[in-house]
Amino acid sequence: MKQSYQIFTAALLASVSLAAAAQARTVSDEQMLDALQAVQAQRSTAMQRYAGGRLQTIWNPQVKHSNVDWWLRSFGEWESYGDDAVSGKSRSVAAGMDMNTGKETRTGIYGMYNHTELNGGTAEALQQDWRIGAYMGKQHGAVQQYGYVNYGKLGNHYNLAEVDMDYKYRGQIVELGGEYKYDLRHDDGKTYHVSPYVNVQASRYMQKSYSQPFPGAPNDLVAVAVNNNYLAGETGVELRRELQNGNYAVRLGYKRVFAGEAPLLVYTMEGVGETQRYSYDIDKDYLHLTLGGTLKLTKNLSATAEGAWLEGEHDRELKADVKLNWAF
């Protein structure tokens, strides 16, 4: 019986290419997709974009806001990893409200849903990401700063058509982050602003161990629990111009992932002592270009649009979003 289990393990190795030497860039496209799905929610900057974008609108002197405001925002994202070995697309929508909690402080809450699809080789994956969170921002003189925190539940679906594998599993995420920005021309009274900035993003992803039937094997395939800590930061400069009915801005920054970009995935077959391990090292260094602006539509309604390009050595992302703000 033990020999049979070893045969099934060998079949598993052949089917999904679980290489014994888990070196970066040597994994199969299917493995790469599996590893990317594990860190996808942590890499997302949606929460940062929602909180920071909302507060930037509030701090725009040309856009009206009141003690309590509501906002609605959606964005799309297109991704490529491993020199196009894996591609993906995301759609997200979020809604929230905020209020004045001090002379210079604004505090809000929000909820978000994000839908991500990834494709690589003969595999495809789907991730559904639900979040609730809060944010707080303060503008004092030339300084603008904010922080945010959120909690989310993830529904993951991985399908490998080659061997008829169709797995579903869940995870949880806790994230926090923030940004500090200083306007070098705050006291000039000019419509042009030059602002160096630095931001940080940290999160923990928690996925319990789960087991699924494996085609042709008498026992289940077991995925060991994943607990991954992720940390990234970015620094750069923002050029912004204020207009009579809004503003527009350009950002150029350098992003660095310090930890958690390559969680280790471990699989085993029930009844067999051997385990199979692999990970995929996503790029750690990126150039980040962002273009955006806000336009006042009516007395109480404004719209914000933004596009961004994130470029690494092997991986890249393209982002676009739009937001509506209501002041009551």
Task: Tell me what each language-model feature is.
Residues 1-16, 20-87, 169:
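Outer-membrane translocation/initiation segment of Type V secreted surface proteins
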Residues 27, 66-69, 74-328:
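Membrane translocator/pore-forming domains, dominated by Gram-negative outer-membrane beta-barrels
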